[in-house]
Amino acid sequence: MQCADLQRVLATLPAPSEYWVAYSAGVDSHALLHLLSQCRDGVSAPLKAVHVNHGLQKDAPTWAAHAQAVCDDLGIELVTLQVSDKPAANQSIEAFARDQRYRLIGDAMPAEAMLLTGQHQDDQAETLMLQLLRGAGVDGLASMPLCREFARGWLARPLLEFSQDAVMDYAKTHQLQWIDDPSNASDAYDRNYLRLQVMPLLKKRWPHAAQTIAKSASLLGEGRHFISAQLSEQLHARVNQRCFSVESFSELDSFA
């Protein structure tokens, strides 16, 4: 995992006004932030980091202070945001934290900016497996796209082609200091259960399981894009500015 790898991925994405790295202070986002800082001269837009205090852990202020210290050391501006709401009694804490995080960051980012997150290949494999267990269709099984529209700009995941081991090797090679969220050690959460209990068993039998599962997600993403393009073409052929034919729509395959 080197600058050339990251620059190659970024070159395939829209050109933003700024790059914002979602920096939790964990190992994945720290590795991404550090890698970007090492090759910032070859990056086409200014670089910032953003840290969200969800207010869910007693040590959250310590994490924010650590994030600030790391960014100061790297010479990167850090934007710190605070979640003020609390999850409802029957609400998933994971979903609450994710929704609040993206809402706050989306509101804070300027137009045409790109949020970069640290999800990697193993995260993609876990996402596909979760979607399978939920009975998802093509949209869900395509899992996490490399880039999508977000707020007034984009959200991209430039580490999706790299394994968890590659990210960890980078962090150890560069002697990065990160914070382990204690909630990641609990298999009470579905994703953690897959990560801690299921994936190790799969990798014991099939060492490249995460890579091949993530590849399936990528292929499903291509299929989703093709279906979307075909559906758009069919809609344009059947709708004009004033009306559309119900009969022509009834001729479409039910999958469309």
Where are these regions (language model features)?
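Core alpha/beta nucleotide-donor-binding catalytic domains of modification enzymes
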Residues: 1-196, 200
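ATP/NTP-dependent adenylation/nucleotidyl-transfer catalytic domains that generate, transfer
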Residues: 189-256
